[in-house]
Amino acid sequence: GFMIQGGCPDGTGMGGPGYSIKGEFAQNGVKNDLVHTEGVLSMARAMHPNSGGSQFFIMHKASPHLDGSYAAFGKVTEGMDVVNKIAGVRTDYSDRPLQEQKIKSMTVDTFGVDYPEPEKC
């Protein structure tokens, strides 16, 4: 596959936090120059542009067809070997890993910038 996805609070791949946030990408009227190259983090969503909540995906391979349509917001700076390992595990018919994969720890570096809460819809 081209990405790995996570962030569903109930573990089904269909759940969310009970709210959604505005999609911050060009097709939704928001300037976002971060492109979907290997290691980029982006918000997962349903068909509606403002349907993102807690689910996200990490690019395993460059996917320029997502640029402007999904809200890229970060990049893996260490641990792409882990991303690649997860991307290579055996999956079922719907691309879910046969063995559960969990992020045990993560650090977010905002480089000193304080970002506001995202706009909820």
Task: Enumerate the predicted regions with their spans.
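Cyclophilin-like peptidyl-prolyl cis-trans isomerases
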Residues: 1-121
